[in-house]
Amino acid sequence: SVGFKAGVKDYRLTYYTPDYETLATDILAAFRVTPQPGVPPEEAGAAVAAESSTGTWTTVWTDGLTSLDRYKGRCYHIEPVAGEENQYIAYVAYPLDLFEEGSVTNMFTSIVGNVFGFKALRALRLEDLRIPPAYSKTFQGPPHGIQVERDKLNKYGRPLLGCTIKPKLGLSAKNYGRAVYECLRGGLDFTKDDENVNSQPFMRWRDRFLFCAEAIYKAQAETGEIKGHYLNATAGTSEEMIKRAVCARELGVPIVMHDYLTGGFTANTSLAHYCRDNGLLLHIHRAMHAVIDRQRNHGIHFRVLAKALRMSGGDHIHSGTVVGKLEGERDVTLGFVDLLRDDFIEKDRSRGIYFTQDWVSMPGVLPVASGGIHVWHMPALTDIFGDDSVLQFG
């Protein structure tokens, strides 16, 4: 009989495989790993691969009932981060079978669910994911995408213009609708609910939807253009969220909105499916993203959250503004803006893109430049984002 030794064993014996040739169907991850003092980088990288796939802290008899070689994550390459002491990029390959089809939720639960609290690591950041076509093809993706949106709106060859209604909290529904009308009548394409406008005591969601619809139709009639207001459908339960989206559809408005990180990927994917089935555009706000992506050496980089959103579904997503910040940030932002819009994006480490990403024919997402921008930023914004973007003022 084949016996085995119980007890704690090094992960690198099983999960560090520098000679592994990655498969076209593997999901690849690049982690920025900061090991605890005294932990070798190979062990830290292997620990990440193990804990986010099949591993546990010892050998168990049930390991013999499956094929670890078929299902284990593998740390296949480690490189030191230039200019950082004791920090490494660990590349991990995951077999496709570890993931449920069409579930961003399951993908994140597997890859980042458990491993970030790991004792052997001082800090861990997921920098990038390579999503193979074999996996991305199991997702619907954006409800409509850039081209279909332009056809719906009949607006071509320029960025779309929007603004957020302020004060974001405290207006009555009627006064809110009045502000929406003034903005749309004045020439904007879109106005927007703020991310925290849901259904508060001073303005219940249905009242807001009705007055905003009235404002949209009045502005459309007077300008001869198609107008929209991002009606925030985010709610405390996914059933209530869908109820609000149904109401928006019945009013005949073109677009609804969702806070995808606070609302969650499961709710977001449900809403995206509803929007495609019912001809609604879907605007995505990234409230809470900085909790996850702000630290340089711990968390998840926004480019991963952006890729996940393209799979889960959204037609617009907030992507920062670049204006007035550091130059390096510009390249990194443009990197994930391309990941949102383009079909095929080459690996380019100078822009933070660790893997070549092939989306095949998944529709693109319009990046939304929003937050503290005003008319003087216009030349810079059109230079940075080009035509396929939404410039969201106010």
Swiss-Prot record:
EC number(s) recorded for this UniProt protein: 4.1.1.39
Binding site for Mg(2+): K192, D194, E195
Modified residues (N6-carboxylysine): K192
UniProt enzyme class: lyase
Alphabetized GO MF terms: magnesium ion binding; monooxygenase activity; ribulose-bisphosphate carboxylase activity
Main location as per UniProt: plastid
Site (Transition state stabilizer): K325
Keywords: Calvin cycle, Carbon dioxide fixation, Chloroplast, Lyase, Magnesium, Metal-binding, Methylation, Monooxygenase, Oxidoreductase, Photorespiration, Photosynthesis, Plastid
Signal peptide: none
Annotated GO CC locations: chloroplast
Residues where substrate binds: N114, T164, K168, R286, H318, S370
InterPro entries with a match to the protein in the record: RuBisCO, RuBisCo_large_chain_AS, RuBisCO_lsu_C, RuBisCO_lsu_C_sf, RuBisCO_lsu_fd_N, RuBisCO_lsu_N_sf
GO biological process: photorespiration; reductive pentose-phosphate cycle
Active site per database record: K166, H285
Keyword Chloroplast: yes
Residues with PTM N6,N6,N6-trimethyllysine: K5
Pfam families for this protein: RuBisCO_large (PF00016), RuBisCO_large_N (PF02788)
Superkingdom of the source species: Eukaryota
Cofactor or coenzyme needed: Mg(2+)
Subunit note: Heterohexadecamer of 8 large chains and 8 small chains.
Further facts: The basic functional RuBisCO is composed of a large chain homodimer in a 'head-to-tail' conformation. In form I RuBisCO this homodimer is arranged in a barrel-like tetramer with the small subunits forming a tetrameric 'cap' on each end of the 'barrel'.
Protein name: Ribulose bisphosphate carboxylase large chain
Organism, scientific name: Barclaya longifolia
Taxonomy of the source species: Eukaryota, Viridiplantae, Streptophyta, Embryophyta, Tracheophyta
Gene name for this UniProt entry: rbcL
